[in-house]
Amino acid sequence: MALRESRIKTLLLSLVYPSRASYYNDWRDAFTSHPAFDCTELNILGLAPDVLARHLGAADAIITLHSCNADTLDYFATVAPVLGERRRGRLLSFVGNEYNSPYFSVPERTRLLGIARADVVATQLLQEAGAYLYGSIGARVVAVPHALNPNAFKPGPAAGARSIDIGVKGYRYPAFLGDDDRNRFLASLSATGPEHGLKVDISEDKRLGRAEWADFLGQCRGTVSTEAGSWFIAPNDEFIGRIAAYLRERHTGLVISNDSWLRRAARHLPSPVKSLLWAVTKHGPVKFEVTNDNAVPFDELYERFFRDTPRPSAYGKAISSRHFDAIGTKTCQIMLRGRFNDILVANEHYIAVDPDHGNVADALRRFNDVSQRRRITENAYELVLSGHTYAHRAAFVHRLLTE
C-alpha cells in the first residue's frame, strides 16, 4: 500500500529533558495530533540501540525533531548509526540552533545526518542557507520554518485591557554570533519607549515556559524582536574555532567546560533548579563555560574577529517560533527590518525599524496609533492562520515523505 493511501506509521524521535524551548512541544504536538500521522514516540535520551532498531522495523517514516541535535550531539551520535542501518522508512531530520557555536560542531552534526542517511533535512533557514550548511551529504534540503500553534497561543484580551505596552522575556544573544542587533534594539526600546508614554517590561534574564509565555504575551499590546540566527554561518568550524580558542584563553578561576559530565548532568535537572544553578554560577567563583564566555564584551569579539570578516552569501537569519507566538496572541510586533523567511512583510505584518534605528521614534508613533496597530496585528494573524500553522507544516512534511 502506498504511503499516501493511509496514515503513515511514523517513528517520532526527540530528546526530552527539562527545557523552556516551547517550540519543541509545538512540533511534537503537530505530528501526534495530525490525522495523517500514526506516531510512535521515543526519547533518544538513553535509548538502547536494539530498542530503536526494533521500532525502525515497523516504521514507514522516521522524523527526528529539532531537539535531537540542537543543544548537544551526545545522544544523536548514538542513534545515528542505528538509523543509518535501517532497511525501510524515509528519514526526515529537523535541525535545531542553526548557527556556529563554540560549544557545538556544525560539521559534526552534518556528518551525523549523513551517517543516519537522512533523506530530507528540514532547515529553519531559507533553503539556500540550509543547502550551504548541509548540502555535502546529498540529502534533499528543504526549508520548513516554524509556525503558529493556535491551541497554545490564542488571541489575548482586547488591546485596551492589556496592562503592558511593550514586553519581552528572554535571554541576551551571545557575542560569538557576531552581531549585537537584537541586544542593542531591546536596549534602545527600553530607553525610548517610556519617552513616548509607553509602559515597557523588557528583561533578558529569563525564558518562560509555553503557558507562561502565552499568558505574558496576552498582557502586552506589543513586543520587540529581530530575526533569529547569525550573519556568520559556515559549514565548517574554522572561524568559530578561533573564537572558541580565544574564549578559552580568557578563562580565569574554575570554569566547568560545556562538554564536561557536570554540564551534561545539569541538562537533566528541573528548569527551576537549572535557573538557580545558572544564577549562582554567573556570579560565583565557579562558572559554567557558557556563562563565563557570555560576560565577554561584544565589542571585544567584534573588533578581534568580525569587523573585517565578510559575511557569507547565504542568509543566516530566520523567522522564529516566538514571532508566530506573538502573532497568535494578537500582540503587535516592532522589529528590525528583515526577510523573516519571506513570510512577513515590513509594515504590513510588523512595524519595521531600520537597522540604524533612525526611525524608532516614527515606529513608536505608529505603534501608538490604535488603528495602525490593529491593522498590522490583524494582517499578521490572518496571514498565519491561512497557511502558517503547525498543522500546515505537518501536512507539508507528509507530502515530502510520500511524494
What are these model-predicted stretches?
Residues 3-18, 22-44, 212-403:
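Catalytic binding pocket for nucleotide-activated donors in carbohydrate/polymer assembly enzymes
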Residues 148-162, 178, 211-212:
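Acidic anion/phosphate-binding donor-loop and adjacent secondary structure
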Residues 186-202, 250:
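A conserved nucleotide-sugar
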Residues 160-177, 219:
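Conserved donor-binding/catalytic core segment of Leloir-type glycosyltransferases
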Residues 200-206, 292-294:
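Active-site donor-binding acidic/aromatic loop of nucleotide-activated sugar
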Residues 22, 176-188:
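A conserved mid-protein helix/loop that constitutes part of the nucleotide-sugar donor-binding site
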Residues 2-138, 147-155, 361:
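Extended catalytic core of nucleotide-activated donor transferases of GT-like folds
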Residues 55, 112-114, 209, 216, ...:
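Structural alpha-helical scaffold elements that stabilize or flank donor/cofactor-binding regions
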